[in-house]
């Protein structure tokens, strides 16, 4: 199973993204790709914030991901574990969200995380293979 990070999801759905082709390929070619519902919220936030995609289009793009990959909700235990791991690893600020994704990937037995930001995951997921498209 392969966990896809938010950056891959954004690049995969946004045709004007400079890495659209490789992100789309990562989504289509990964063995059993999946993500969590929080990554969908981050995708919508990134599309409407950084890329200024209108909310209606951003919602359609984000929700269309459910047809392409498996999406699972995070459990309270995922948040609790991620916070404990963030504390033990010295993770602060927005790195908490990468810790949350890594915790989820670990719980769901992902063998890989595909991301456009490998340095974000090397610290929070040293036990999982980190790939870039």
Where are these regions (language model features)?
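Histidine- and aromatic-rich ligand-binding microenvironments
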Residues: 5, 35-36, 94-95, 117, ...
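Internal alpha/beta domain cores that form substrate/cofactor-binding pockets in large enzymes
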Residues: 63-64, 74, 89, 93, ...
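A generic structural signal for short hydrophobic patches within well-formed alpha-helices
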Residues: 9-10, 40, 121
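Active-site neighborhoods of divalent-metal-dependent phosphate/nucleic-acid chemistry enzymes
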Residues: 70-116
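Short, well-structured N-terminal submotif of metal-dependent ribonuclease cores
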Residues: 1-35, 50-60
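Helix-adjacent hinge/juxtasegments
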Residues: 53-58, 66-68, 72
